[in-house]
Amino acid sequence: MSNIGKITQVIGAVVDVEFADGNLPNILNALVIKNPNNADCPELICEVAQHLGDNVVRTIAMDATEGLVRGMEVTDTGNPIMVPVGSASLGRIMNVVGRPVDEMGDIDAAKSLPIHRPAPEFNEQNTNVELLETGIKVVDLLIPFPKGGKMGLFGGAGVGKTVILMEMINNIAKQHGGISVFAGVGERTREGNDLYHEMKDAGVLEKAALVYGQMNEPPGARARVALTALACAEYFRDEENQDVLLFVDNIFRFTQAGSEVSALLGRMPSAVGYQPTLGTDLGGLQERITSTTKGSITSVQAVYVPADDLTDPAPATTFSHLDGTLVLSRQIAELGIYPAVDPLDSTSRILDPNVVGAEHYSVAREVQMVLQKYKDLQDIIAILGMDELSDEDKQTVARARRIQRFLSQPFHVAEVFTGTPGVYVKLEETIKAFRGILNGEYDHLAENDFYMVGGIEMAVERYNQRQQAA
């Protein structure tokens, strides 16, 4: 017999439900409310968050609560939110509760999984380290991606996090050919729509599952949609032994949704108004994103940085979970250098000669040294000008400016608004080109020859065209 309760109170996204004696649903159980007053959401799913006493549970709604009234019947499903997984989810867009939102009919999955699951045991985890090529020069050279690892793209508003993420989806999904899962967490619906059509045009959609809970969704959906995507990815890793790519845009919105709900649940706010359970919430998600002996989940996460402050509790808590951090800088974006990656602030755990090889490591470190020297000299240049520098410093500055421009790159996904065709650059070409710049082989080329090119041969070609024209 089903367990039925009644609504006693509705406050925004939080719904209180009273059950009979001894029939309280477990924490994290999904409850279903038939809501005939709301045509957009006739069946609302809520998740139990707290037991308040007096047989009342406090729940978080996964959709709009308009039309709910006190006394409505609520049914306990007896399980957490269950979402369809497996090949039926590929090429489709679903919401937080696993319902399709692409108007292409139901998702006929043979299996459903709960969105809340324990992280893999320590002895099931895989510790092999391997580099994953992205085709983006600055990333492959200075911030190499570990296969089966977690990378974060940190940046303030409008510095290009989503564009880099989309380029990685385009490059890695095409080259890697495996299965991708994309979680749109509290971002623009327009970007979700663009991504769907880009993946369709690129022919990678049939190998991707998309899970959206965008900006207009209630906080309950935004706080759980990343877990829905993770359940899809875990199925491919554990049951089908696949190497899966998990893209999350934006992990900050997951935290933000948690803080919106936290106050409604009556918890005391902690630093900067965030929920007191910030570390636990994020840890519960991040610990499940890992490689096991069966397969791997490689995750790329965009992290919004409020007011460009990396010490804000949300980005600061995220840092500790990641294998690599790709920090996007507004100063570099202002120079017109895209991707606006800060090569001195970004780090990767696998930039190690034992993993990437001695040549790659030495080129990467020398590039960083030249850029750091240029940064140190900038105050002197600003006050006294270039003429006051020694010949050696002048050469360092000239090479640093060439390196800085060569770290820019035209993207496939930005082709629509730049008009420049995107380029995928192989890792060995990247290392060879930067070694050449460091050794002075390209000192005769102008700085602008290096701007927005793919391989070094494109820069040389620009120089040759100029020489012929002259």
From Swiss-Prot:
Q: Which PANTHER family match?
A: ATP SYNTHASE, ATP SYNTHASE SUBUNIT BETA, MITOCHONDRIAL
Record-given protein name: ATP synthase subunit beta
Q: Where in the cell is it found?
A: Cell inner membrane
Instruction: List the Gene Ontology MF annotations in alphabetical order.
Output: ATP binding; ATP hydrolysis activity; proton-transporting ATP synthase activity, rotational mechanism
Protein family: Belongs to the ATPase alpha/beta chains family.
Q: How does it assemble?
A: F-type ATPases have 2 components, CF(1) - the catalytic core - and CF(0) - the membrane proton channel. CF(1) has five subunits: alpha(3), beta(3), gamma(1), delta(1), epsilon(1). CF(0) has three main subunits: a(1), b(2) and c(9-12). The alpha and beta chains form an alternating ring which encloses part of the gamma chain. CF(1) is attached to CF(0) by a central stalk formed by the gamma and epsilon chains, while a peripheral stalk is formed by the delta and b chains.
Q: Which SMART domains match?
A: AAA
Q: Which UniProt keywords apply?
A: ATP synthesis, ATP-binding, Cell inner membrane, Cell membrane, CF(1), Hydrogen ion transport, Ion transport, Membrane, Nucleotide-binding, Translocase, Transport
Q: Chief subcellular site?
A: membrane
Task of the protein: Produces ATP from ADP in the presence of a proton gradient across the membrane. The catalytic sites are hosted primarily by the beta subunits.
Catalysed reaction per UniProt? ATP + H2O + 4 H(+)(in) = ADP + phosphate + 5 H(+)(out)
The membrane-spanning stretches of this chain are none
What InterPro entries does the record point to?
AAA+_ATPase, ATP-synt_VA_C, ATP_synth_F1_bsu, ATPase_a/bsu_AS, ATPase_alpha/beta_chains, ATPase_F1/V1/A1_a/bsu_N, ATPase_F1/V1/A1_a/bsu_N_sf, ATPase_F1/V1/A1_a/bsu_nucl-bd
Enzyme Commission (EC) number: 7.1.2.2
Under the heading Pfam families, the entry gives: ATP-synt_ab, ATP-synt_ab_N, ATP-synt_VA_C
Q: Where does ATP bind?
A: 155-162
What topology does it adopt in the membrane?
Answer: Peripheral membrane protein
Organism listed in the record = Oleidesulfovibrio alaskensis (strain ATCC BAA-1058 / DSM 17464 / G20) (Desulfovibrio alaskensis)
Gene3D superfamilies, per database record: 2.40.10.170, Bovine Mitochondrial F1-atpase, Atp Synthase Beta Chain, Chain D, domain 3, P-loop containing nucleotide triphosphate hydrolases
- Domain of life, per UniProt, equals Bacteria
